[in-house]
Amino acid sequence: MNIHEYQGKGILKQFGVAVPKGIVAFSAEEAKQAAAELFEEQSSPVVVVKAQIHAGGRGKAGGVKLAKSPEEVYEIAQKMLGTTLVTHQTGPEGKEVRRLLIEEGMNIDKEFYLGITLDRATSCNVLMVSTEGGMEIEKVAEETPEKLLKIQVNPKYGLQGFQAREAALFLGMQGEQFRNGVKFIDALYKAYTTIDASLAEINPLVVTKEGRVLALDAKINFDDNAMYRHPDFHELRDITEEDPLEYEASKSNLNYVRLDGNVGCMVNGAGLAMGTMDLIQLAGGKPANFLDVGGGASPKTVEEGFKIILGDKNVKAILVNVFGGIVRCDRVAGGVIEAAKNIGLTVPVIVRLEGTNAKEAQKMLDESGLSLIAANGLRDAAEKVQKALASA
């Protein structure tokens, strides 16, 4: 689950992570009042108006503006609220701006990158710091890897003092900045582990001319599998920032990711799902989604999966590709038949079932009286997908 910048900063602040003063606003009038409050409290000649959407690259898209008065903030907020920001992370459809963060201006001296995430290859948390603040960390790692330091942190022992100091020294911090930097890194790691985050990213981490170390931006992603331990975080979810179909899928515990293709796919198992997407591509189509119904696919699960796939109007055909290991093929076939009867399939459906009770499943499909297209093997499935697209 993703949350907004202002929500992430609010959580981090509880753990002692230094963040600028900021106030969220849902209207131009609220933005003006927030700015007036900040100007009264601070000595900075500017405040920052920041669009709150679940995507990076807001500055380049016009989603971050400086203002020198509450009146100017009001004008900016009027123009920004309700507009659609298109960044490299939103896709061409963009995201509508529904809320703003009004934040105190900073007297910035240096900008850095700081992030913590899980390294699955080593089963450790990894602390990453870079002198290239404000840049995409993937780009830094590829083009200037010498400017990026990765420190493996064993979750059994946690972040050690020498590791936090190593990171601060790599960034060139000295004196008061160094002490504040080490304190900041310690606090961020504590927050990351306590809230079961999958990512805690500060980009940029800034050092002011006064020696303060603060999170100018914050991105927090939660591990969905640990959300039961943090019921209070559920209220932070902003479903308007999520794809409606992905949100519906999450309510049915389906692993669904919407793509921009024309062939829907329903598969059991992530590996087979990715292989199926390659198969669709080779057949001349483009996958419209990733959908893993899991090992315990039931008729109800299959029906919900079909509803979600058909919610994408770009879908011209559907490929069901199931290997019956834990789940029986006849059970999946029953779900496909039931779904076809209940929701009225309007596009060709190619069904390839292999494994436990595959013959029984094939017989059920043949005797269903429905226009379901059975496939024998992957090659046959690919050819039938190709044929379905040609006639669509």
UniProtKB/Swiss-Prot annotation:
Pathway field: Carbohydrate metabolism; tricarboxylic acid cycle; succinate from succinyl-CoA (ligase route): step 1/1
- Binding, ATP: K50, G57, R58, G59, E103, M106, E111
Q: Recorded GO terms, molecular function?
A: ATP binding; magnesium ion binding; succinate-CoA ligase (ADP-forming) activity; succinate-CoA ligase (GDP-forming) activity
Cofactor: how bound = Binds 1 Mg(2+) ion per subunit.
Tell me one Pfam family matched here.
ATP-grasp_2
Q: Which GO terms describe its biological process?
A: succinyl-CoA metabolic process; tricarboxylic acid cycle
Q: Which residues bind Mg(2+)?
A: N203, D217
Its Gene Ontology cellular component terms are:
cytosol; succinate-CoA ligase complex
Q: What class of enzyme is it?
A: ligase
Domain ATP-grasp: residue ranges: 9-248
Keywords noted in UniProt: ATP-binding, Ligase, Magnesium, Metal-binding, Nucleotide-binding, Tricarboxylic acid cycle
Tell me which residues bind substrate. Answer: N268, G325, I326, V327
DNA-binding as a keyword of this entry, yes or no, is: no
List, alphabetically, the PROSITE patterns matched.
Answer: ATP_GRASP (PS50975), SUCCINYL_COA_LIG_3 (PS01217)
- Please give the InterPro entries that the UniProt record associates with this protein: ATP-grasp, ATP-grasp_succ-CoA_synth-type, ATP_grasp_subdomain_1, Succ-CoA_synthase_bsu_CS, SUCC_ACL_C, Succ_CoA_ligase-like_bsu, Succinyl-CoA_synth-like
User: Which cofactor does the UniProt annotation name?
Assistant: Mg(2+)
Keyword check for Membrane, yes or no.
no
Catalytic reaction equation(s):
succinate + ATP + CoA = succinyl-CoA + ADP + phosphate; GTP + succinate + CoA = succinyl-CoA + GDP + phosphate
Give the EC number(s) under which this enzyme is classified: 6.2.1.5
State the oligomer form and interacting partners: Heterotetramer of two alpha and two beta subunits.
Similarity field: Belongs to the succinate/malate CoA ligase beta subunit family.
Function in brief: Succinyl-CoA synthetase functions in the citric acid cycle (TCA), coupling the hydrolysis of succinyl-CoA to the synthesis of either ATP or GTP and thus represents the only step of substrate-level phosphorylation in the TCA. The beta subunit provides nucleotide specificity of the enzyme and binds the substrate succinate, while the binding sites for coenzyme A and phosphate are found in the alpha subunit.
- Name the record gives this protein: Succinate--CoA ligase [ADP-forming] subunit beta
UniProt organism field: Chlorobaculum parvum (strain DSM 263 / NCIMB 8327)
